[in-house]
Structure formats: structure tokens, C-alpha cells
């Protein structure tokens, strides 16, 4: 076979580059070629795929089976021509992209055995419960595995696999829509637009029912000897949507930590984890269907309607008592809320306080984040050791009492960024859609401030507030020299963070009479950053693979059974040095890759 991954895989788009590199790293050269071809040409038959990729048909078919198993490829059989078409599915490769973080999180949360189960499922794509347990002979081990599988499934980390999971969502929608439209009769009293919209609404209902079918308790579980377990015939796979919700929880927690403080962010993290499983998906099925929702206003209204429905159903609503039950034992919130109402010094009989003497030396009380922003007027003759704070409104006897947690929730709901919304007294919900805008904005601003400097950061913030401005206006507003402003504008333009608009003052558009305005558009700026991060991730993976290929002979030698464990005795000093450098280089690159991936996740789905 002479086929190689085409150069277009790297140049076509940043996503194409990343997905092809991931496929090559985890699944091999042939899988990368097939993925690249399907991204370039769209859906193809096996024969067309073989012709365009120059891979033998037999090898194409065997590779397609593995890729379908791993959810990297979807297939669709046309009813009229009976041909089977294959199309690219990013879900499988995204699981490979996050596999390390997925396994690490499951290990920390559920233990090593649960992490092993998730790792096995990721490796094979999906599996039947009875097939997974049939090779285990010890009944006690089988019982433990069944309990772990039930726990992971109940918490949403595993999901049921159905036929619709292997079919392209566009083809599935189109088939249902055409059937519904055909069964919706034309009428002289109903316009064609109304008829089409009516058919769309009916199709949405059918499509939702199709995706949610097969999830009844009778089909998923069975009770044997009074013990509940998953049905042996159930086919399960890892649920990527559940992990994306977990990453969103981490992003929101980090934002709260940066804006409010560590202890409040811990309380917020508990609140987010409480409703995480039932929170709205980051990738809703309707938004993946081409041409269904094109208007940004309509898309925003649709996303908000989903969130509002979850609030109405009480799925993303919690109260203070719920948090008290799940608060970690090592979380100590005592004396974390310091205000005028909570710091009233009581009368101390050992030393009288003269109320007639004016206060000349006010004491400062440090808050959790170290800011001296609260001033309490205390008598200078009263030492700090003799103060007895009467906490009338907060209970400091317990590390996380109801009143303490409630005050932290008040902090989260009353700030500039609405981390929480108080529906009724003591009952809260999380405005996910609005908060993700703040997450992107704050991380973007921080990135500019740390990489380009304070002047660029000030300039961009000024431009955001002014919407549209020229150099002179910007210089006067942020109090910088025009030369400095010009230099910073040049840096921002090179990174596509701002746009330039030419404004001619004469009909002939003479350059001497032309001036320029600047603006910042979030969508284009975020899009450029996202593509840059995506390309960098692919480039790092390619570099790791490249220096492994450059030292292929040495690495193959180390993999030999007689060499493993005896490297220091059997390898030359130069080979040991090269091996150590390779290891350090790979560790550094993987660390860089994970840091970039953290930003990539924030700006994904912007």
C-alpha cells in the first residue's frame, strides 16, 4: 500500500489536522487516511473511499468496522439504492482526546476498579454487559463489577448504545422530516411556510422520542434476588456529554475562585456537582443538524428554553440544606464571613469601654482573600485577644452550617457575575448559558494581559466599551501616547483580536484623507484563538510522533522482552542518554498539550 495521509489533512482546517493526527496516533496510518478522506469529501461508499484514498477495498472495509466500533465513523443505508454510505463522527476521537483526563477523574472519584472499567470501554468503543463479565469466574468479583457498572451508569458516565448512535444525525433527521412532511397534507387555508414549520415541530418531537427511546427501567435494569443490576443484554459506551459537564463545572469553579475566593468557590463547586448530571448538554442534538437552526437569535432562544425547562422541572435547582448534606468534611467555613453584622464586640467585664472617647485608631479586619476592605470601629484600649465576637446571624460552631453556606451563596448570587440565581428564598439555580460567556471573556482577557502586556489589555477593554474608535480617541481615553497605541493596535491586529475599517473622506478615496476605525468582535476573535489552539495541539502530537519515529530502532530495542528491566546493563551510555532525553521531551510536550487543551475546552462551542 502506497497511500499516505494527504497534506490537505493539515491545511484544510485546524480540526481536520487535529482529528487526523489523533487517528494516526491512536489507530494507525490507514485509519488516519480514511478519517482525512471523509472529512474532505463528506459521506462516501466503501468503494469511493477506496478510490479516493488509494487504500485497498478489503483494508478499507476492515478498518471501517473498527472505526464504527469506536464511534469514529457513522454509516447510513439508503432505502432506494441499498448503498451504504460512511461519514465522519467526531465523538470517538474526542473521547480519545480526553481519555487521560477521563480515566484520571474516574479514578479520583470512584476508585481504580471503576477507572479500569472505563478504560476498557474506551479501548473497545462499546460492549455488552454479559460479554464483559463472562470471563470472570469468581462470583464475588462479578458482583463487585456489577455494582460498579450500575453506579457508573446511574451517575451518567455510561450510556446505552442504540442503532441511532451509529447513524449520521443529519440523515436520521432528514428521513423523519421527509416522512412527516409527506404525511402533512397541503391545504388552501394553510400557507406552505406554516405547513413546513408544523412538519418541523412534529419531527422534533419524533426525533427526541427516538433518541430517548429504550431508556425505560424495564429495558435497562433487572432485579435478581432483591438486588438491582444492569440487564446482561445491555450494550454500553462511555458518555462524552457527561464528561463535558464535569469540565464545565471545573471552569465555573475556577472563575468563582478567581473572582470571589477559594472558600466560596468550594461551596460553589459542591452546588455545581449537585446538579451536574442533569445540567444542560454542551452539544445539543438539534444544534448539530445542518440547517435546522441558522439564526443566532433563534439558537439562543432554543438554548434558553432548554435551561428554563430544566429549572421548571427542578432538575437544576437546589437549596441550602442540600449543600449541607454533601459538603466535604474537610471544608471549614468558620469565620469566613466577616461583615459589620457578624463582628459586634460584646461587653467584657474585665475592661470597661469608654463610649465617649472618639475612635482614633480603627482596626482593619482581613477577609478571606487578604483584602482590607472591611473596617470595624473598635476602641483602641480593647486588645484583639479580649474580643468576643457575637455571631448573631451566622453559626460558627460548625465548619459548614446552614447559615454559613447560605451567606456564601448570597455572595455568589449578588455579584457582578451572576454565578447563581435565587429563585425563591434559599433556593438557587445556575444560569449556565450566561456564565459560559463570562468564562470565555475572563479567560480571554487574562490571556491577553499575560501574553501581550497591560497596555494591550487596557486598549482592548477600552475598545470593547467604545465599540468603534480611532487611534486618537483611544489614546485620549486610555491616556497613552499615540505611538504606543499604534504599536499595541498592530499586535492585536496580527492576532485577529481587532478589526480595522477604512473611512474615506473624499470620493476618490485618497490615502492622505483616509482615517481608520477599529473594533473588536468576540466571535471572530474567539474563532481565531480556537483554531490556533486546535492547530497547536495537533502540532504537539505530531512532534511527539516525529521524534519517536526518528529513534524508532532504539525504542523497538527497549521493547524487547530481554531488554525490559535491564536497560542500564544492555544499552550503551549514549543510548541511555538519548532515551532519557526522549522521555523528558515527551513529558514536556504532553504537559504543554494539556495546558493548551484546557484553553481549547473553554473556547469550544463558542
Curated annotation (Swiss-Prot):
<dbReference type="Pfam" id="PF22536">
    <property type="entry name" value="POLR3C_WHD"/>
</dbReference>
<feature type="region of interest" description="Leucine-zipper">
    <location>
        <begin position="533"/>
        <end position="554"/>
    </location>
</feature>
<dbReference type="GO" id="GO:0042797">
    <property type="term" value="P:tRNA transcription by RNA polymerase III"/>
</dbReference>
<comment type="function">
    <text>DNA-dependent RNA polymerase catalyzes the transcription of DNA into RNA using the four ribonucleoside triphosphates as substrates. Specific core component of RNA polymerase III which synthesizes small RNAs, such as 5S rRNA and tRNAs.</text>
</comment>
<dbReference type="InterPro" id="IPR055207">
    <property type="entry name" value="POLR3C_WHD"/>
</dbReference>
<comment type="subunit">
    <text>Component of the RNA polymerase III (Pol III) complex consisting of 17 subunits.</text>
</comment>
<dbReference type="GO" id="GO:0005666">
    <property type="term" value="C:RNA polymerase III complex"/>
</dbReference>
<comment type="similarity">
    <text>Belongs to the RNA polymerase beta chain family.</text>
</comment>
<keyword id="KW-0804">Transcription</keyword>
<dbReference type="InterPro" id="IPR036388">
    <property type="entry name" value="WH-like_DNA-bd_sf"/>
</dbReference>
<dbReference type="InterPro" id="IPR039748">
    <property type="entry name" value="RPC3"/>
</dbReference>
<keyword id="KW-0240">DNA-directed RNA polymerase</keyword>
<dbReference type="Pfam" id="PF08221">
    <property type="entry name" value="HTH_9"/>
</dbReference>
<dbReference type="GO" id="GO:0003697">
    <property type="term" value="F:single-stranded DNA binding"/>
</dbReference>
<dbReference type="Pfam" id="PF05645">
    <property type="entry name" value="RNA_pol_Rpc82"/>
</dbReference>
<keyword id="KW-0862">Zinc</keyword>
<dbReference type="InterPro" id="IPR008806">
    <property type="entry name" value="RNA_pol_III_Rpc82_C"/>
</dbReference>
<protein>
    <recommendedName>
        <fullName>DNA-directed RNA polymerase III subunit RPC3</fullName>
    </recommendedName>
</protein>
<dbReference type="InterPro" id="IPR013197">
    <property type="entry name" value="RNA_pol_III_RPC82-rel_HTH"/>
</dbReference>
<dbReference type="GO" id="GO:0003899">
    <property type="term" value="F:DNA-directed RNA polymerase activity"/>
</dbReference>
<dbReference type="GO" id="GO:0006386">
    <property type="term" value="P:termination of RNA polymerase III transcription"/>
</dbReference>
<dbReference type="GO" id="GO:0006384">
    <property type="term" value="P:transcription initiation at RNA polymerase III promoter"/>
</dbReference>
<keyword id="KW-0539">Nucleus</keyword>
<dbReference type="Pfam" id="PF20912">
    <property type="entry name" value="RPC3_helical"/>
</dbReference>
